[in-house]
Regions:
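N-terminal Sec-pathway targeting helices
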Residues: 1-10
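N-terminal cap/lid segment of alpha/beta-hydrolase-fold proteins
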Residues: 12-49
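Short beta-strand element of the alpha/beta-hydrolase
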Residues: 50-59
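Alpha/beta-hydrolase active-site loop
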Residues: 66, 99-104
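Conserved alpha/beta-hydrolase
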Residues: 75-94
Length: 104
């Protein structure tokens, strides 16, 4: 009985990981950084003609990883998607400034 439960547990874990990665299959996902800019990710369906670009951003206390399901869905629909982290959020190493009335 324990062996059957263990096998079912392993199968459930494998299925969960497969389902998490299924959304990325067939897409080109390229992290990049432009000089001193924020870290970003480019999502593109390979073999597609040049497509309209969609910039996916996050709200306060968010990250590009949080917005990844939107980026994946748009890339699957044929758009070229660029997603990035604002200062002080996600993997952007630059801290958020205290003065929110000026832009550096």
């Amino acid at each position: 009985m324990r062996a059957a439960v263990a096998i079912l547990g392993v199968m459930a874990i494998v299925l969960s990981v497969w389902m998490l990665e299924a959304g990325r299959m067939g897409l080109s996902i390229t992290p990049f950084k432009v000089s001193d800019g924020p870290p970003a990710t480019l999502y593109l369906a390979p073999g597609e003609d040049p497509a309209p670009v969609v910039v996916v951003t996050h709200g306060f206390a968010g990250s590009r990883q949080l917005m990844e399901p939107f980026s994946l869905a748009l890339a699957r629909a044929g758009y070229m998607v660029v997603s990035f982290d604002f200062m002080g959020h996600g993997r952007n190493p630059r801290p958020m400034t205290g003065d929110v009335t000026t832009i550096n």
